[in-house]
């Protein structure tokens, strides 16, 4: 091993992430960089090349971080090794951004020249500043007629405090400005400085399961080197393995003889169980281990919970295995077994938001062929019991009876909404309607305002984002963070079918809205549950008090068609027999509840509740 050669190679490494608000063109810039450096041929090139998950291409968004090694021949005659990590822009996937940044020395801060700095631009920049990264401002979409690069530079300087006078102006669509951007990366992103002679220390920043190779770990080598045949130890679990392959993504896997300090690549080591590693763990040498592990990641708690059940109860174990494999690739997903009287055996899953929940459901259906029933999402409540203890409630059906607790607390968030001046009124009206408390309002410039509200998380996770977009014609952007729990007047509403509570349909609501929500729910269930051969009573109840009711009339068979004589006694006898049969059927008949009904709570927007 020629240390001088390796040190020279290390000096030419540049590790950087691309961060931005959703739809500001991160993936398009990544495409142009790959194209300009001849990393992919013209024949292989396609839009969103690094978004290799089918779901990402369907939705047109980045969901997973993705790394790629690029060789760039610079104007100084040297060849540089770029490790580029593309990141998501949606607030639900900010944990992917923080993991990407931990593997880098620099970050390209991409801002849309037509929209300027948005909520997630700020949030992601602060993550990069916390990691002490070199930040390069990049103004994208300068080819558009409405582009205003000077406005963007002023905003970056005023709102973020970065010098943007020499921000690179580019067009991800046409490739304009990309050569200048590559030169700026060489000049401004520092090379990694890890000690090549130190014991191996590597951070696992992502992982996935391969049916043939087992667990494939995405790693950033902080110190030392690693090659096939080396014995490694996962510091968190103490498990030891022998490395079978190391390499980089370019963008398809390319085997290498070794990875050195500063490299971002992958390794395999016959790790067969998904439980033996986790994202954020440190890998070291089993023979000469390092003393201290790397800091890893702050575990982000779920914000939204939902029940997940296989339509066929025989597939419970398949669902468990699929969730374990998915969790390897999605560190923020949490799940634990739960049982429902209505749906059988399943899992209570924790997500970072509704988009995250949708993505997990779609990935399970597309990648693992699962047929699922999902219950309506809920937040994590705290019930303060009479004895002073706190009970965590992530399933509304688990909330105890009213006499058993003193109060229920719900999570509150600080919501920051960036909005054009013209739409401040509708935004404030929407926030007030969602039980928001006004905090402050900052005028960012003569066109835009940052409105800050304290709001219950439960009001945000349903349809707040959709309503915000529709009331501002798509111009508003939202960022929020949990600030704590507050006692609120909340009640549990049970939905009963023929006097039997359906646990999966229970939900928690503010007392003032409880009756309207229960009425809306019964009306929806009446529409969604098909008619049966017997009458179905739908009721909403708080404890023993019925607060809403609807009835689904049964099918009625004409049992008198055989009577030709018009005998009234015979007719009455047949109808009475039919009535008795239906009554017996109602007592023993099981009402089949379709999947749509379990998601009905989601569809209860304010207009429905107010009966408009």
UniProtKB/Swiss-Prot annotation:
Q: Which GO terms describe its cellular component?
A: plasma membrane
Alphabetical GO biological process terms: positive regulation of translation
EC number(s)? 3.6.5.n1
| Superkingdom of this protein's organism | Bacteria
tr-type G domain sequence ranges: 11-193
Q: Which UniProt keywords apply?
A: Cell membrane, GTP-binding, Hydrolase, Membrane, Nucleotide-binding, Protein biosynthesis
What's its membrane topology? Peripheral membrane protein
Q: Which GO terms describe its molecular function?
A: GTP binding; GTPase activity; ribosome binding; translation elongation factor activity
Q: Where in the cell is it found?
A: Cell membrane
Major location, coarse class?
Answer: membrane
Catalytic activity entry: GTP + H2O = GDP + phosphate + H(+)
Query: Pfam families from the xrefs?
Result: EFG_C, GTP_EFTU, GTP_EFTU_D2, LepA_C
Summarize where GTP binds, as residue positions.
23-28, 140-143
Coiled-coil portions: none
- Which CDD domains does this entry report, sorted A to Z? EF4_II (cd03699), EF4_III (cd16260), LepA (cd01890), lepA_C (cd03709)
Which family is it part of?
Answer: Belongs to the TRAFAC class translation factor GTPase superfamily. Classic translation factor GTPase family. LepA subfamily.
- Function according to Swiss-Prot or TrEMBL: Required for accurate and efficient protein synthesis under certain stress conditions. May act as a fidelity factor of the translation reaction, by catalyzing a one-codon backward translocation of tRNAs on improperly translocated ribosomes. Back-translocation proceeds from a post-translocation (POST) complex to a pre-translocation (PRE) complex, thus giving elongation factor G a second chance to translocate the tRNAs correctly. Binds to ribosomes in a GTP-dependent manner.
Name of the protein in its database record: Elongation factor 4
Q: Which organism is it from?
A: Lactobacillus johnsonii (strain CNCM I-12250 / La1 / NCC 533)
């Amino acid at each position: 091993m020629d240390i001088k050669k390796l040190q020279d190679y290390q000096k030419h490494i540049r590790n950087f992430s691309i961060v931005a608000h959703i739809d500001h063109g991160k993936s398009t810039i990544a495409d142009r960089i790959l194209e300009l450096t001849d990393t992919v041929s013209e024949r292989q090139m396609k839009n969103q090349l690094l978004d290799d998950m089918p779901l990402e291409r369907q939705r047109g968004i980045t969901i997973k971080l993705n790394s790629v090694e690029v060789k760039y021949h610079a104007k100084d005659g040297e060849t540089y090794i770029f490790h580029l990590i593309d990141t998501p822009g949606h607030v639900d996937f900010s944990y992917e951004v923080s993991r990407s940044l931990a593997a880098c020395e620099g970050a390209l801060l991409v801002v849309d020249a037509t929209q300027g700095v948005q909520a997630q631009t700020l949030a992601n920049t602060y993550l990069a500043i916390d990691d002490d990264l070199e930040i390069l401002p990049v103004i994208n979409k300068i080819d558009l007629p409405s582009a205003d690069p000077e406005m963007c530079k002023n905003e970056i300087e005023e709102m973020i405090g970065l010098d943007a006078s020499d921000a690179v102006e580019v067009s991800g669509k046409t490739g304009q400005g990309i050569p200048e951007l590559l030169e700026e990366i060489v000049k401004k992103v520092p090379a990694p400085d890890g000690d090549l002679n130190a014991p191996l220390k590597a951070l696992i920043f992502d992982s996935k399961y391969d049916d043939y190779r087992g667990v494939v770990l995405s790693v950033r080598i902080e110190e030392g080197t690693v090659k096939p045949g080396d014995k490694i130890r996962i510091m968190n679990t103490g498990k030891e393995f022998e490395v079978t392959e190391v390499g980089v993504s370019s963008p398809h896997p390319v085997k290498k003889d070794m990875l050195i300090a500063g490299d971002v690549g992958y390794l395999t080591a016959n790790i067969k169980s998904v439980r033996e590693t986790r994202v954020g763990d440190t890998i070291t040498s089993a023979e000469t281990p390092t003393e201290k592990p790397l800091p890893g990641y702050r575990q982000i708690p779920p914000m939204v919970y939902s029940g997940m059940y296989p339509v066929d109860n025989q597939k419970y174990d398949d669902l468990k295995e699929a969730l374990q494999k998915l969790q390897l690739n999605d560190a923020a997903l949490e799940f634990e077994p739960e049982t429902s009287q209505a749906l059988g055996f399943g899992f209570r899953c924790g997500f970072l938001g509704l988009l995250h929940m949708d993505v997990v459901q779609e990935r399970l259906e597309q990648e693992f062929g699962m047929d699922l029933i999902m219950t309506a999402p809920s937040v994590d409540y705290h019930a303060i019991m009479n004895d002073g203890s706190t009970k965590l409630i992530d399933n509304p059906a688990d909330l105890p009876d009213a006499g058993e607790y003193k109060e229920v607390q719900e999570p509150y968030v600080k919501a920051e909404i960036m909005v054009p001046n013209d739409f401040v009124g509708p935004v404030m009206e929407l926030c007030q309607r969602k039980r928001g408390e006004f905090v402050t309002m900052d005028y960012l410039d003569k066109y835009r305002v940052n409105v800050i509200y304290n709001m219950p998380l439960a009001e945000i996770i349903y349809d707040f984002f959709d309503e915000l977009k529709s009331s501002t014609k798509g111009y508003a952007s939202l960022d929020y963070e949990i600030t704590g729990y507050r006692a609120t007047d909340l009640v549990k509403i049970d939905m009963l079918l023929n006097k039997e509570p359906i646990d999966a349909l229970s939900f928690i609501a503010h007392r003032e809205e409880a009756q309207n929500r229960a009425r809306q729910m019964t009306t929806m269930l009446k529409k969604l549950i098909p008619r049966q051969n017997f009458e179905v009573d739908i009721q909403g109840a708080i404890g023993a008090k019925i607060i809403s009711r609807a009835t689904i009339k049964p099918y009625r068979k004409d049992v008198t068609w055989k009577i030709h004589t018009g005998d009234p006694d015979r007719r009455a006898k047949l109808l009475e027999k039919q009535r008795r049969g239906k009554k017996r059927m109602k007592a023993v008949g099981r009402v089949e509840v379709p999947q749509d009904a379990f998601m009905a709570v989601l569809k209860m927007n304010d207009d429905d509740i107010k009966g408009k």
